[in-house]
C-alpha cells in the first residue's frame, strides 16, 4: 500500500530526502511451497514492479527532494537454524532489487544495497556455524546485529567512513600538541608522572547498545555486529595518542572519573576512547540513545494505528472514520489476523485525536530535550603514572 500512502506519509511532510525500500512482503511466502511456485513468484514480482512504476512517476514529479532506493535486507535461505524455509524467496527479492538499481541509475537517484552484503557476511559466518543468521526468529526480520550492519552500509554509502569523532596526538616529552582533528585541546600541562589537558570534541561517540532489545524475539545486540563489520574503525574513532611518555602504566581519568589503566605502549599506538562506555561523553551519548528509543516507542504507536487504517479500514470505506463502526469491522477481522491482534489495542487508543495529540507533544518534548543536551562539553583528561 505504499502508493496509497505517499501523500499522507511522505509528500504532505515536505521532505528533502526520501528513501524507498520494498520486496520482502511483495514476493510472498507460502507460494514457494506450491508446485507452480516459479509462476506464482513471477506474478508477485510483476505486481510489485507495476506498483513501483506508479510510485516512480510520483517521485519523478517531485523535484525538490533527493530520492534514494534501498535494496532490502535478505531472506536467509542458507542458515540451518530450522527447516522452515521458503526456497528461492531471496532470488525473487533480488529480481526486485535489480529493477530498483536500474531505476535509480536511469533517474539519477541514490541506491544502497543491503541484501548482498548481508548475504556474504552470513555465508562466511555459516562456514563456522551453520546456524548463524541475522534473522533468528523467522529468516526475515534482522536482529539488532543485522540492523546495525544495515546502518553501517547506509552510512558507508553516504561517504561518511573515515570521519572521526575526534583525533588527538600529543608529544608528552615536549608538551606539544602534534595534531588534533574535530576537537579543541587546551591547557595542556606536563605534570610529575603524567600530563593533563582540556578536551572539547565537535561530536559524541556512538553508544553501542550491548543489550538485546526491541521486538521480534531479538537475541543479539548492536555490539555483536562489531565482529562482522569495521564500524568502530570507520565511524567511531575517538583516538588519543600520547608519544614519548616515560615507560610504564598510567591511570586515565576524565573529569576525575577513572576510565582505565593503560600502558605507555598502548598510548604510543593510540587508544580509542569510544571503546570505553564509562567516559562522560559516552554516558552523555547513552542518555541521548535512550531518549531516542523512548521517542521510537511512541512513534511506533502511530505506525500501528496507520497500518490498521490502511490495511483494513480503507478497503471498507472507513479510512480515518475512527468510530464504533470501524471498531466493529476490525473485530470481524481479529479472529483470523494475528498481525491485527498485535496492533488492535493501539488503534483503540490512537483513534482518539486527543490521545494522538498528547503522544505528538511528548515526542516533540523528547526531540527538543535531545537537541538541548546533544552538544559536547569540555572535559579534563588526565594521565597519571602508576608504575
Where are these regions (language model features)?
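Alpha-helical cap/lid subdomain in secreted, periplasmic
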Residues: 3-387
Amino acid at each position: 500500500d505504499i502508493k496509497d500512502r505517499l501523500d499522507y506519509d511522505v509528500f504532505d511532510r515536505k521532505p528533502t530526502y526520501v528513501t524507498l525500500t520494498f520486496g520482502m512482503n511483495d514476493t510472498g511466502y507460502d507460494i514457494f511451497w506450491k508446485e507452480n511456485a516459479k509462476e506464482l513468484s513471477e506474478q508477485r514480482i510483476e505486481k510489485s514492479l507495476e506498483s513501483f512504476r506508479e510510485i516512480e512517476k510520483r517521485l519523478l514529479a517531485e523535484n525538490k527532494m533527493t530520492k534514494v532506493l534501498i535494496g532490502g535486507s535478505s531472506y536467509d535461505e542458507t542458515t540451518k537454524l530450522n527447516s522452515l524455509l521458503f526456497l528461492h524467496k531471496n532470488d525473487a527479492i533480488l529480481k526486485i532489487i535489480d529493477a530498483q538499481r536500474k531505476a535509480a541509475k536511469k533517474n539519477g537517484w541514490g541506491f544502497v544495497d543491503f541484501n548482498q552484503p548481508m548475504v556474504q557476511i552470513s555465508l562466511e559466518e555459516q562456514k563456522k556455524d551453520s546456524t548463524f543468521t541475522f534473522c533468528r526468529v523467522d529468516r526475515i526480520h534482522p536482529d539488532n546485529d543485522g540492523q546495525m550492519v544495515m546502518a553501517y552500509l547506509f552510512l558507508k554509502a553516504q561517504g561518511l567512513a573515515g570521519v572521526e569523532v575526534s583525533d588527538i596526538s600529543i608529544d608528552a616529552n615536549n608538551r606539544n600538541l602534534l595534531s588534533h582533528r574535530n576537537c579543541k585541546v587546551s591547557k595542556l600541562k606536563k605534570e610529575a608522572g603524567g600530563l593533563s589537558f582540556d578536551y572539547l570534541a565537535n561530536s559524541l561517540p556512538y553508544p553501542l547498545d550491548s543489550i538485546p532489545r526491541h521486538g521480534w524475539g531479538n537475541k543479539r545486540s548492536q555490539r555483536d555486529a562489531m565482529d562482522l563489520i569495521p564500524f568502530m574503525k570507520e565511524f567511531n574513532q575517538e583516538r588519543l595518542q600520547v608519544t614519548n611518555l616515560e615507560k610504564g602504566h598510567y591511570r586515565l581519568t576524565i573529569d576525575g572519573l577513572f576510565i582505565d589503566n593503560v600502558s605507555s605502549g598502548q598510548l604510543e599506538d593510540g587508544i580509542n576512547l569510544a571503546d570505553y562506555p564509562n567516559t562522560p561523553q559516552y554516558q552523555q551519548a547513552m542518555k541521548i540513545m535512550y531518549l531516542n528509543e523512548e521517542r521510537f516507542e511512541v512513534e511506533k504507536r502511530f505506525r500501528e494505528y496507520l497500518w490498521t487504517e490502511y490495511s483494513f479500514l480503507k478497503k471498507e470505506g472507513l479510512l480515518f472514520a475512527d468510530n464504533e463502526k470501524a471498531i466493529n469491522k476490525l473485530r470481524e477481522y481479529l479472529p483470523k489476523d494475528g498481525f491485527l491482534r498485535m496492533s488492535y489495542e493501539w488503534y483503540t487508543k490512537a483513534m482518539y485525536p486527543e490521545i494522538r495529540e498528547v503522544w505528538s507533544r511528548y515526542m516533540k518534548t523528547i526531540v527538543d530535550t535531545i537537541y538541548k543536551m546533544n552538544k559536547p562539553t569540555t572535559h579534563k583528561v588526565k594521565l597519571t603514572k602508576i608504575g
